[in-house]
Structure formats: C-alpha cells, structure tokens
Amino acid sequence: MGKVILVTGVSRGIGKSIVDVLFSLDKDTVVYGVARSEAPLKKLKEKYGDRFFYVVGDITEDSVLKQLVNAAVKGHGKIDSLVANAGVLEPVQNVNEIDVNAWKKLYDINFFSIVSLVGIALPELKKTNGNVVFVSSDACNMYFSSWGAYGSSKAALNHFAMTLANEERQVKAIAVAPGIVDTDMQVNIRENVGPSSMSAEQLKMFRGLKENNQLLDSSVPATVYAKLALHGIPDGVNGQYLSYNDPALADFMP
C-alpha cells in the first residue's frame, strides 16, 4: 500500500496543487482532503477516483477533524503524513482598528484547528513514524502592513512545529513558507484588502509582483510539501521553520 496522507484546504490554491503533485509523484498514494466547499472536492474525486477521498466541513469543528481522521483509518488503516495547509488572511487591519473577535476567528482557523487536528491524528501518526508538514508564511517574521493577525498566527504555528518535533520523537514536523504564490489570496490582496487596509507602498509591491510575473506558480511550493509528506522530513530539519527554497530543502524542490 502507498502512503496515506491528510491534506487540509484542498479546494483551491496551494492545497489543490499539493493533491495534484502527490498523485503525479506516486501512483499508489491515497489522499484524504477536507475543505468547506464541496464542488471542488467533487472535481478532484472525479479526476482521481479511489485515490482521493474527502470530508466537507469547517475545520474549526473537532467533529469534522475526527471524521477526516476516522475516514482515513477506516478506509486505509493508517495515516503516514499530515499537511496542514488551510488558512485565511483576514482580518487585515491596523493596530488602531483591532477587532479581537476577528483575530480569534482567524486563530481558530490558522492555528487552533491545526493543533486540534494534530492531537486527533497523533496516535495514528505515531504508529507510522509519520510526518506533519505545516504551511507557514514569510509573514511570520516579516512586517506586512496590517497583517498582524495572520503573521502572528503563522509564528505560533512555527513554534508548534518545534514543540511537536521535540516532544513527540516518533513523529517529525516542519513548518515551510511557500513564498509569494499566484493564488486567490494574492488577488484579494491586490483588489480588496490591500487598497482598503494596507500601505500604498506595500500594495504597490504586491501589484508589481503580478505585473512583472514574479509570483510563483503554486506547483513549486506544493512540490516541496508533497515530497516532504511522501519521503519524510529529514532529521536535520525536524522542528525547523524554513522557506520552500532553503538549501536544506534542495532535494525536495521541483
């Protein structure tokens, strides 16, 4: 049997690319995905058949996470890797306009849902000496105008990766930033939250990246995530936060 891999946020962007790359790299891989929108999940199911299975639901609800884990164990008897990809950017707001409830909602999605999923899946991951790959962001340690909620949630995720790697020796963990990728999030930055909430200088920077064709295709970082999930996280980078193109990850690049 091939690897059995859980991936969150598979309906679009990097998450969908991770699924596509996994199947292109290994014909025996099985993926269990979760997202809120069923239509894109149905398309993946139609494309990949009995290699792809899915759960529709809100990842902030433990019942959905348990359903995902239970489906994989019941269907294929194990979980080899987990790729925690799902996340949101908003609220994008200056510190003078902070809406704490909006921050809490973001943290529920970007951080606490992942902590919960790891906790639920950990007994199965320990059986396979599994891997947990966290999709982080350069915003964790770089300032982007009004991205306090998003950036800090990714910093928390990085620390959780380090904690997991040190406290559970049977499972490896890594947090990897994908670079600036040509996804719907970038469209939202250029057209919505950027004009309304970000500095003119940084909005110009993001628009320039698109105009100059400097945004990454999602398949590039997706390949790194997929290979880490398939081949395992090397001991030398276990518990670390790295960029997708860090020399330590050269063997995982496209």
From Swiss-Prot:
Keyword NADP on entry: yes
The protein's enzyme class: oxidoreductase
Binding positions (NADP(+)): V7, N85, Y150, K154, V181, T183
InterPro entries to which the protein is assigned, alphabetical: NAD(P)-bd_dom_sf, Sc_DH/Rdtase_CS, SDR_fam
Gene3D superfamilies associated with the record: NAD(P)-binding Rossmann-like Domain
GO-annotated molecular function: benzil reductase [(S)-benzoin-forming] activity; oxidoreductase activity, acting on NAD(P)H, oxygen as acceptor
CDD domains: SPR-like_SDR_c
One Gene Ontology cellular component annotation held by this UniProt entry: cytoplasm
UniProt keyword list: NADP, Oxidoreductase
Active-site annotation: S136, Y150, K154
EC identifiers of the protein: 1.-.-.-
Note: Present with 2370 molecules/cell in log phase SD medium.
Family that this chain belongs to: Belongs to the short-chain dehydrogenases/reductases (SDR) family.
Name the UniProt record assigns to this protein: Uncharacterized oxidoreductase YIR035C
Species whose genome carries this gene: Saccharomyces cerevisiae (strain ATCC 204508 / S288c) (Baker's yeast)
